[in-house]
Design a protein with these regions (language model features):
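Carbohydrate-active catalytic/glycan-binding domains of CAZyme proteins
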Residues: 1-306
Length: 306
């Protein structure tokens, strides 16, 4: 059990994602925090959609005592006042990374749910609070943080593999399809990138100068330590090349949330991010104390039978 627990807090940055990528930092841009949570609870993984002058921010909500993430929506008016907050999706398994987007005349959510051993695409039945499973996306691996984008006349899907714990952070895969529902074809070069500092998706893709720019997590120092822009310089059904930019870390002004930044989601004129601090876990400490006490106990001498 970890002695310290990650506590994330999302914020709305008053700048476009393109401006943030160009600057290489959120430093200097005004930001507004989402509401705080209670002890050992957090919100994370913000994704947003504007509709009728309102910003709908979808987030993971997590409580360390329950240990299963669920999805909520926070609704902001044009002046960024919080006007509503509702639960939107709960399953028997952990949910996070509620990537919401509009395509093919519908509103979709593709949440991270690798503990269900499948990737489920949800369709909004009554936006923003009611969603139904619409499609199981079949891939070469159980996907982590699957992130779709339509570009160059086809769909692309970026994800890491849930096969092994290190792969979740470091093994980037790609698949492509003509339609969102598939069928999806895994890229022949998978994993197209193996690097703990620039593989796991961390937000909504951008298209800058005709190239896909995928926010990816730098987990080299700590989980979700920073975001880097990964620019696809060559992306075809049989080729993949990419260049990675510098790490974007929390500014000092976001203290105490300065220990990680692992989402960068474009939302029109603003950008959604989340930053972390860590909190000392008494439960973790108590387990560690018991473990140390056992080490100090004198070992019994084995009895010898004659």
């Amino acid at each position: 059990v970890a002695l310290r627990k990650d506590i994330w807090r999302p914020a709305i940055v008053m700048a476009t994602a393109e401006a943030i990528v160009a600057r290489g930092s959120i430093q200097g841009f005004p930001l507004m925090w989402l509401p705080p949570m209670g002890s050992f609870q957090f919100l994370a993984d913000p994704f947003g959609l504007w509709r009728d002058g309102r910003l709908y921010v979808f987030v993971e909500t997590y409580d360390y005592r329950v240990r299963i993430g669920a999805i909520e929506v926070l609704v902001y008016d044009a002046d960024f006042r919080l006007v509503d907050r509702q639960p939107v999706l709960n399953e028997a398994w952990h949910l996070s990374y509620p990537l919401v987007f509009e395509a093919e005349g519908e509103t979709w959510m593709l949440p991270e749910a690798h503990r269900s051993n499948r990737l489920t695409l949800y369709r909004a039945v009554d936006f923003p609070t009611r969603w139904e499973p619409a499609q199981i996306i079949e891939l070469d691996h159980v996907a982590v943080d699957a992130t779709p984008v339509f570009h160059g006349g086809r769909w692309w899907l970026f994800y890491t593999s849930a096969d092994r714990e290190p792969d979740k952070m470091s093994a980037l895969h790609v698949a492509y399809a003509d339609r969102l529902a598939g069928p999806w074809t895994p890229h022949p070069m998978n994993p197209v990138r193996v690097d703990v500092a620039s593989a796991r998706p961390g937000g909504m893709p951008l298209v800058i100068d005709g190239r896909i720019v995928l926010p990816v997590q730098d987990c080299s120092r700590t989980y979700g330590g920073a975001i880097r822009p990964l620019t696809m310089t060559v992306l075809t059904p049989d080729r993949f090349e990419a260049e990675v930019g510098d790490a974007m870390v929390p500014p000092a002004s976001s203290a105490p949330f300065v220990e990680g930044l692992h989402t960068l989601s474009t939302a029109g004129p603003v950008t959604l991010v989340d930053m972390k601090r860590t909190e000392l876990s008494l439960h973790g400490l108590s387990i560690e104390a018991v473990r140390e006490a056992k080490k100090l106990r004198p070992k019994r001498r084995a009895s010898v039978r004659g």
